[in-house]
Amino acid sequence: MNPAACVGRFAPSPTGPLHLGSLVAAVASFLDARAAGGRWLVRMEDLDRPRCEPGAAGIILRQLEAYGLVWDGDVLVQSQRDHAYAAALDMLKAQGAAYPCACTRAQLVQAPRNREGEMLYPGTCRNGLPADTVARAWRVRAPDASIRLHDRIHGDLQQNLAREVGDFIVKRADGLFAYQLAVVVDDAFQGITHVVRGADLLWNTPRQIYLQGLLGVPTPTYAHVPLITNVAGQKLSKQTRAPALPERGRDATLAQALVTLGHPPPGELAGAAPAELLTWASTHWHIENVPTHPVVAKPAP
């Protein structure tokens, strides 16, 4: 493919500063784009406003710069794009692919769960709202068909949306648009061709591919890098109190991220500046070297 046509992205949620797990995802997407001579964009996924932390977006951008991860173009901010998501929802409504749902969480507490612990919607409102109810959210009808996906790290996968996911929400009861819709709209808007992100989002990908088909937008290639866990096996996150990226010793932290991705830098680069490490890594990037299994973050000595 024409290298100039390769566009990757890093799309953090500003719920706090970046940690090692988010650095690994950022580095992987950066290297994948740069190795192809392409562009690397940044998007702030602040769609879930109640979870966002004031000032976190600025902190994240400064962390990226400090670690040598320089992006192209302007940063796209999801909270400024409700008009685009509303237009996409209108398209789904016009096709009959989306329908209003009046169900509350309390009403769905007994619904079955899938292997990811997500609720499998029982279809209560699929054929129309029950009497004396009002719409609270909007769902997309999940087809009883397998959505196929080739992941550049995990290989060929498939998921039956109706049986494994169920009709899923695209606009929430609190009026916020759901991640599944927003990410599809924004990837298309930014011309993203290569999505490289954490393996916790692999399960969501067939839903996004289905929405791409309904909305008539291209499907990018996907690669899901391993999750970084603590010694208890929990994904590094704000909820598990993952420490923020250190301001000192960035070379060692970046080298740790590269080792995690199966690209250990040579000994002569010990202590090298982040920009030098990333230059080396972009010329040696081979996505087939990235492991498929979660990696335990070793505590700092």
From Swiss-Prot:
Its EC number is 6.1.1.-. A motif ('KMSKS' region) lies at residues 235-239. InterPro entries: Glu-Q_tRNA(Asp)_Synthase (IPR022380), Glu/Gln-tRNA-synth (IPR000924), Glu/Gln-tRNA-synth_Ib_cat-dom (IPR020058), GluQ/Sye (IPR049940), Rossmann-like_a/b/a_fold (IPR014729). Signal peptide: none annotated. GO terms for cellular component: cytosol. It is an enzyme of class 6 (ligase). Belongs to the class-I aminoacyl-tRNA synthetase family. GluQ subfamily. This is Glutamyl-Q tRNA(Asp) synthetase.
